Amino acid sequence: MIVDSSALLAIILNEEDEPTLASAMVDADILRMSAANWVETAIVVDSYRDPAVKVRFDDLADVLRLRIEAVTVEDAFRSRAAHNDYGRGHHRARLNFGDCFAYALAKRFREPLLFKGNDFSQTDIEPALKD
């Protein structure tokens, strides 16, 4: 399963849907995240002044054995295509920069994507959580 920044942040920040997202991650055989999404998540986490948030991020990545996948040239092209098809200003899904890399990784590995919100549900990506 591919993990988007939104899902990981919801767990780290103890948001309302944390139990559902955490359960999906624990039940997955393998968890992957694009290096671009990992950095995106780290930037958000590091903006919090609470050191416990940073510790939760680092610990969670270790406990879940989250695989940080390098961005390939193919991912770069897929991310651009995702932006052209589903990005802000192009489509109601309004995928942002990070979303496009999560999309590309899900396509590369042909794995469902765990995310929070409704942006990806308006694309052709397979969601990890079904409605």
Regions found by a protein language model. Give the residues of each.
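Short loop->beta-strand "edge-of-pocket" segments that line small-molecule binding or catalytic clefts
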Residues: 29-32, 65-69
